[in-house]
């Protein structure tokens, strides 16, 4: 990941950007701004008007006089599924393949239509299984978000799930 990254929230009613700078005591806010979107530009997390989103991002960058091009974005809405599952315990190097096979039973989308990731929550539960959070996001949605960022001449270094991004921000602030 880039050392300095701007958080870019592509929301249903506005685009928001936040720039933080690491200090000795934590983080300091160096820039924040919001650019409204025309209604129906983004509906249920799906980008309906890519050109309008790109223009809003560019306008926000210009108004805030941001020079940093590396951004972190998050995906939310109906195109993201998060589910806690347990799988038979296996070697770490076999876990990726096992999860890809297991995911078919837990997500309502075709496996070829999604990006899949996971986080191990408990390597061995009392029943000898590995508990994990399975995350699936529609590939088309991820591609649309990445494309508007690139079309705005920015570089997406992180594509996260919105709820996880919020949790990570909370943990950085209060741990």
PLM ranges: what are they?
Residues 1-102, 142-146, 151-155:
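Non-catalytic, solvent-exposed interaction/assembly segments
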Residues 74-174:
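Active-site neighborhood for divalent-cation/phosphate handling
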